[in-house]
Swiss-Prot record:
Cellular localization per UniProt: Cytoplasm
Record gene name: mch
NCBIfam families the record matches: one_C_mch (TIGR03120)
Organism: Methylophilus methylotrophus
Similarity remark: Belongs to the MCH family.
Top EC class of this enzyme: hydrolase
Name of the molecule in the record: Methenyltetrahydromethanopterin cyclohydrolase
Protein purpose: Catalyzes the hydrolysis of methenyl-H(4)MPT(+) to 5-formyl-H(4)MPT.
Length: 176
């Protein structure tokens, strides 16, 4: 996430990989470099100069070569870009289950598109509920039948202890 004073946004896109701030990039041994970067921000506000400068430092890209795409969570664009990450969500869970990512051969996924929301929390709830309760991911893996069967049992969101609770409720409980 990016924040400064009253500005807060979740970010995604190639700029995130360039910054490499998340532990996942270290675990995967992934490093990227580029002269320009794009970040999709879940915000309806242009980031302040302090945030732009931080992103420039973190990515190693000059501020004038950064592009920020604003997609408020409560907008149609925000809804689409969040729900489109259903395969990313599945791969993230595969990683947290310690299934070797190099054994994932292919994948495809889809989720229903909920209507835009009147505010951030409702938008977060609708989009994540669409992924968790309406999303379908088809993951093709190599390896033993036992490992594939274990993954098939543990991967679905229905295996979560929070399954059935609306995401907005879980989000509010964790962030309040």
């Amino acid at each position: 996430s990016l924040s400064h004073e009253k500005f807060f946004s979740l970010g995604s896109g190639p700029g995130r990989a360039l910054a490499g701030r998340e532990e996942l990039y270290k675990e995967l041994g992934y490093k990227d470099s580029a002269d320009a970067a794009v970040l999709v921000l879940e915000s309806d506000k242009v980031p302040p100069q302090e945030v732009v400068e931080k992103v420039a430092r973190d990515t190693g890209v000059k501020a004038e070569n950064l592009t920020f795409i604003l997609t408020p969570t409560r907008s149609l664009a925000g809804t689409v870009q969040i729900v489109a990450r259903v395969l990313e969500v599945a791969l993230h869970k595969i990683h947290t289950l310690h299934f070797p990512l190099e054994h994932v051969v292919d994948g495809m996924a889809s989720a229903p598109l909920p209507p835009p929301a009147p505010d951030f929390l409702i938008g977060m709830g609708r989009t994540n509920d669409a992924i968790l309760f309406g999303g379908h991911a088809h993951i093709f893996v190599k390896g033993s039948d036992e490992a594939a069967a274990k993954l098939a049992k543990e991967l679905p969101s229905s295996a979560s202890r929070d399954y059935g609770r609306p995401f907005a409720e879980v989000f509010k409980a964790v962030n309040m």
